[in-house]
């Protein structure tokens, strides 16, 4: 079957849920037996979000092949349950970088390099590349930002040209827009949507389907009005109401007929949708019978999107144990030895996620000490694992001032140190240990009990690691090296004895968890937290 292309744009305001809409549609099409891939176009000039502040961008999601990408790729992977690649995130910076390098090599044979055709051709090639990479039936491309943003214009021109190139019936434009409800007037206003579509049509794109984000169900009259002024059939106006749980959205959009509309407009040869697995999962989510509280101790807690995959993975662990997970957000800068008892006394488990820099580091270490001494389930990820090693070195081995050389380059006991192959690297972007690496597990450990495999593969994003100069001293005092690289050079997982569940991992398991396939470590972490709570 010839590959079909779906483009999702946004209007009126940002953060409308284009990514969830694209991911939900991808799930519905996959449930019809189609092979689907999704990509995100981001109009910012950064090559990738790897060096951006979490306050600016939220989480950096890492793919198997080591790409640092937009957090929407996490939604895509969780919803369609497929591993994406570096080709699934395209930025203005990445495209211009490629075009300028081609110009320097002389690939354009002395021609004047311009936005049209050179930038737009590069953008089109990135769309077609995804189709070829995995031989998929459908490629869904989300265009970041809002129609009308000046930086989005080359992206919109590129997808306009693709519709012309692939021919009628092989592409579909979906516009996600806001329908504000004025409570005082008691009515939904359609004018912002009309103007957004007018802007889109002004650059040559006629939406085939309009998805309306609204807090109130829209009537047939409102659909007809939008259809009339936006030049589409009223039946092609879809209502996308607020949902209690993200994973309900595919079923809500199916009830609105979105996937049927897309199949009809793209003339897709596919089977009837089978949402039974997803429906069963959502039913389970709605009937969770218990609750556990997990203290997430981090430095970016004001912006929950900075830890979105961690939170979703905790929820997945809850699904597997029939409990809802209440995340208690704890700013690590505010945790001290004097207040740690009161701050953490009401949690059933403690998670310290990844991060960079010294801000809040002592609060994380203090929280880990409290979890270790009070036998509260602990899960450390990346920097969280490194902090666990530092805490153990200080308080069990008595190595006063032990630290990471990232935080204290002059420390007498650098139990965490820069990886040898990172020492001559000056550039910050894309130079860390990134992507999927193997890890060999030791038997009779919590990690092995969770995975039930000797060799696992997980995604990494770090420059610093466990310093092997301290391996012997730490293990002699009870630190367990539960997982290492296959050559035994890198320590990937640490645990401790005589504790219900204390696990630190150098990798990022949250990037591989799915709502229908919870990650084993998150599953077991929540399981033990439930047990400890019952006691």
Curated annotation (Swiss-Prot):
Q: Into which EC class is this enzyme placed? A: ligase
Q: Which organism is this protein's natural source?
A: Clostridium acetobutylicum (strain ATCC 824 / DSM 792 / JCM 1419 / IAM 19013 / LMG 5710 / NBRC 13948 / NRRL B-527 / VKM B-1787 / 2291 / W)
- Which keywords describe this protein according to UniProt? ATP-binding, Glutamine amidotransferase, Ligase, Magnesium, Metal-binding, Nucleotide-binding, Pyrimidine biosynthesis
| InterPro entries from the UniProt entry | Class_I_gatase-like, CTP_synthase, CTP_synthase_N, GATASE, GATase1_CTP_Synthase, P-loop_NTPase
EC number(s) given by UniProt: 6.3.4.2
- Residue sites binding Mg(2+) per the record: 72, 142
Q: Where does UTP bind?
A: 14, 189-194, 225
Where is L-glutamine bound in this sequence? Answer: 55, 355, 383-386, 406, 463
An example Pfam family from this entry, by short name, is GATase
Return the HAMAP family for the record: PyrG
* Family as reported in the entry's similarity comment: Belongs to the CTP synthase family.
* Region annotation Amidoligase domain: where it falls in the sequence: 1-268
Annotated active site residues, numbered on this chain, are 382 (nucleophile), 508, 510
Signal sequence, renumbered to the chain: none
Stated name of the protein: CTP synthase
The processes (GO biological process) annotated in the record are: 'de novo' CTP biosynthetic process; pyrimidine nucleobase biosynthetic process
Residue numbers binding ATP: 15-20, 72
One GO MF term attached to the UniProt entry? ATP binding
According to UniProt, the reaction catalysed is:
UTP + L-glutamine + ATP + H2O = CTP + L-glutamate + ADP + phosphate + 2 H(+); L-glutamine + H2O = L-glutamate + NH4(+); UTP + NH4(+) + ATP = CTP + ADP + phosphate + 2 H(+)
Report the pathway entry. Answer: Pyrimidine metabolism; CTP biosynthesis via de novo pathway; CTP from UDP: step 2/2
Miscellaneous notes: CTPSs have evolved a hybrid strategy for distinguishing between UTP and CTP. The overlapping regions of the product feedback inhibitory and substrate sites recognize a common feature in both compounds, the triphosphate moiety. To differentiate isosteric substrate and product pyrimidine rings, an additional pocket far from the expected kinase/ligase catalytic site, specifically recognizes the cytosine and ribose portions of the product inhibitor.
Quote the record's binding site residues for CTP.
14, 149-151, 189-194, 225
Which CDD domains does the record match to this protein?
Answer: CTPS_N, GATase1_CTP_Synthase
| Function in brief | Catalyzes the ATP-dependent amination of UTP to CTP with either L-glutamine or ammonia as the source of nitrogen. Regulates intracellular CTP levels through interactions with the four ribonucleotide triphosphates.
Q: Where is the Glutamine amidotransferase type-1 domain?
A: 293-535
Known PANTHER family for this protein?
CTP SYNTHASE (PTHR11550), CTP SYNTHASE-RELATED (PTHR11550:SF0)
